[in-house]
């Protein structure tokens, strides 16, 4: 048995206020272990795009993308210089791209099954390698660890 404890400490109104705040960046530390995890593991970004951008119009698409890409990269790059290659689309930057349909993107993962992929995200490139192709995870071992230089922690 692999028990988990999940505590719901915020109301939906508090979550919405945090999501739309200009000071808030959106990131996730979720992971899957032994087939179990939290729904945010595969659903955080799709939930923001589907619920808060499309359905509730609480946030513009461009603001949401900035909060999920550029803001976290900028926050970390002072200590982790390689983050200056993240969260941006430009020559020389890491090619980490998610291609999604704003009309259909939505989270589908649940507390019972956090591995259910989000809908409306047909392609994902990590380091220029196709990691999701036509909505299916590929066998590519794309990406690389991001580490702070020694002595900066």
Where are these regions (language model features)?
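Short, solvent-exposed cationic patches
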Residues: 146-153
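Generic long, charged, amphipathic alpha-helical segments
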Residues: 30, 38-40, 51-68, 82-87, ...
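Mid-to-C-terminal alpha-helical segments outside catalytic/metal-binding sites
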Residues: 67-71, 96, 125-127
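Active-site neighborhoods of metal-dependent hydrolases
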Residues: 1-57
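Acidic, glycine-enriched loop/beta-strand segments at the rims
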Residues: 4-9, 15, 59-63, 74-115
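Short beta-strand segments in beta-sandwich/barrel cores
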Residues: 73-74, 130
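C-terminal cap of metal-dependent C-N hydrolases
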Residues: 16-23, 28-29, 98-142
């Amino acid at each position: 048995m692999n028990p988990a404890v999940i505590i719901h400490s915020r109301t939906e109104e508090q979550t919405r206020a945090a999501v739309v705040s200009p000071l808030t960046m959106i990131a996730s530390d979720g992971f899957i272990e032994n087939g179990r995890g939290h729904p945010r593991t595969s659903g955080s970004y799709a939930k923001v795009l589907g619920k808060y951008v499309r359905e509730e119009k609480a946030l513009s698409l461009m603001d949401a993308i900035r909060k999920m890409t550029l803001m976290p990269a900028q926050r970390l790059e002072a200590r982790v210089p390689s983050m200056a290659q993240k969260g941006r689309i430009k020559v020389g930057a890491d090619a980490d791209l998610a291609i999604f349909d704003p009309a259909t993107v939505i989270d589908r993962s649940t507390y019972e099954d956090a591995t259910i992929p989000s809908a409306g995200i047909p392609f994902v490139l990590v380091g220029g390698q196709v990691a999701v192709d036509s909505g299916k995870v590929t066998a590519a071992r794309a990406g690389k660890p991001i580490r702070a230089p020694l002595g900066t922690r």
